[in-house]
Amino acid sequence: MGNCNKPPKRPPNTQTSAAQPSAEFRRTALPSLYGRYNCKCCWFADTNLITCNDHYLCLRCHQTMLRNSELCHICWKPLPTSITVPVEPSAPPP
């Protein structure tokens, strides 16, 4: 009775949700036969790159794209939302 401001109860989602896309963060991109890698969006950044499907994005462009949508503006696939940072040695082995 009366006005109720509670949101309607929804049944639990029985579908399996797709895994969140994951990306690897690299301070410097792997060496290439065709020269250095750059961010495919701004073409300026060549360090601190994130792998997106078949290209690299810098952190700045990645965050800008995530603010606008969940899809990459270049390849139209889901943007990585979790970033894994590999352990890089700080010095060469003895």
From Swiss-Prot:
Gene Ontology process terms (BP): viral budding from plasma membrane; viral budding via host ESCRT complex
Keyword Metal-binding appears in the UniProt entry: yes
Keyword flag Membrane: yes
Location in or out of the cell: Virion; Host cytoplasm, Host perinuclear region; Host cell membrane
S-S bridge residues: none
Residue intervals of every RING-type zinc finger in the record: 39-75
Residues anchoring lipid (N-myristoyl glycine): 2
Gene Ontology CC: one annotated term: host cell plasma membrane
Motif PTAP/PSAP motif boundaries: 89-92
Keywords recorded for this protein, A-Z: Host cell membrane, Host cytoplasm, Host membrane, Host-virus interaction, Lipoprotein, Membrane, Metal-binding, Myristate, Viral budding, Viral budding via the host ESCRT complexes, Viral release from host cell, Virion, Zinc, Zinc-finger
Post-translational note: Myristoylation is required for the role of RING finger protein Z in assembly and budding.
Superkingdom of origin: Viruses
GO MF annotation: an example: RNA binding
Protein topology in the membrane: Lipid-anchor
Region Disordered, residue ranges: 1-22
Name of a matching Pfam family: zf-P11
Subunit structure: Interacts with protein NP; this interaction probably directs the encapsidated genome to budding sites. Interacts (via RING domain) with polymerase L; this interaction inhibits viral transcription and replication, Z partially blocks the product exit tunnel for the releasing nascent RNA product. Interacts with the glycoprotein complex; this interaction plays a role in virion budding. Interacts with host eIF4E; this interaction results in eIF4E reduced affinity for its substrate, the 5'-m7 G cap structure.
Domain remark in the UniProt entry: Late-budding domains (L domains) are short sequence motifs essential for viral particle budding. They recruit proteins of the host ESCRT machinery (Endosomal Sorting Complex Required for Transport) or ESCRT-associated proteins.
Purpose: Plays a crucial role in virion assembly and budding. Expressed late in the virus life cycle, it acts as an inhibitor of viral transcription and RNA synthesis by interacting with the viral polymerase L. Presumably recruits the NP encapsidated genome to cellular membranes at budding sites via direct interaction with NP. Plays critical roles in the final steps of viral release by interacting with host TSG101, a member of the vacuolar protein-sorting pathway and using other cellular host proteins involved in vesicle formation pathway.
HAMAP family the UniProt entry points to: ARENA_Z
Family per similarity comment: Belongs to the arenaviridae Z protein family.
Protein name: RING finger protein Z
